[in-house]
Amino acid sequence: MKSTGTIINKIYSPLSAQGQGVSIQGYEGSFHQMAARQFFGSDIEVIPCATFRDVVKIAANKKESKGGVMAIENSIAGSILPNYTLLQKSNLKIVGEVYLPIKQHLLVNPGVKLEDIKEVHSHHMAIQQCMEYLDKYNWKLVETDDTALSAKHIQQHKSKHIAGIAGKLAAELYNLNIIVPNIHTQKSNYTRFLILQRSADSKPIEGANKATINFITNHAKGALAKVLTLIAGNGINLSKLQSMPIAGTNFTYSFHADLEFENKSQLDSALSDIEKLTEAINIFGIYKNGNNQPS
C-alpha cells in the first residue's frame, strides 16, 4: 500500500493496517497520542507522522486511517496558524476536541540518579517551557525533533548520563523513570487538539454544542462588527476569533470562529442571519465542547 504522507513507523499495526488507526504528529508517546487516547480510549492505534501536513494526508485517506488528531492552539503559545490552512484545504471535518494539560517530566533510565545527569534532550519548545528548572543545573541542553523521540533514544541507547523531557506516556512506553515530575514553569498549560474525520464519513453528533466556522465578510463598512453582533444576538458565545490572510490578496482576511451554543437552532439562526453580510461561510465541524477545558 502506497502511503500519501511520511509515516514515522513504516510498519502499520494490525488495526491501523485496516484503516482503523488515527494519524498523529510525532512519535509514539507524544502528547498527540495522549490526546488520541483521551478521546478514543487507551486501545486506539495511532499512525505517527512526521508533519502536520502528513497527519492531514493520512487522515484523508480511507485506506490508511479512520481520521486524525491535530493540535490547533496552545494556551501559552497561541494558535498554530498553518494548521488552519491545512484544515481549510482538506476534506476533513472536526468531530471533537481535546484540551490536554501539558505536563513535562524529567525522564531517565532505571537506576540513573539526578547527580548522574550531564545532558538533557528534548524538543526546543519543551526545553523552553522548563528553563526555570533547568537553569538550576549546569546541564548541556540538546534539542531533538520530538519529546517522545528523546525518550525513545535514551531508552534505546541505555544512556546513563542523559535525561529527557517528555510526558508521562513516553515514560510508560519506553520504560523510563520520572526522576523529577512537573518541571514546566507555567503550571497551567493546555493544548487544544482537534479530532478530524473525512467529510463523507462524519455524521451528526448528538448533543453537539460547539461549531467551528470560517467566513469572509463583504466589504461594507463595519461588516465584521455586525456579524459578531448577530452571533451574540442569537445567544451564542464566541469563544475564539482568528483572522487569516487570504492568499493572493492584499490585506484581505477570512475569519475562523468557534461558536458555543445550547441548542443547534441557535446556530442555524445565526448562520442564516450572517449570510447576507458574508461572501462565504464554511462549516468545519459541529461537535461537543471539550469536557476538560481550563477555567
Label the model's feature ranges.
Residues 1-295:
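Domain-level signature for soluble enzymes in the chorismate/prephenate branch of the shikimate pathway
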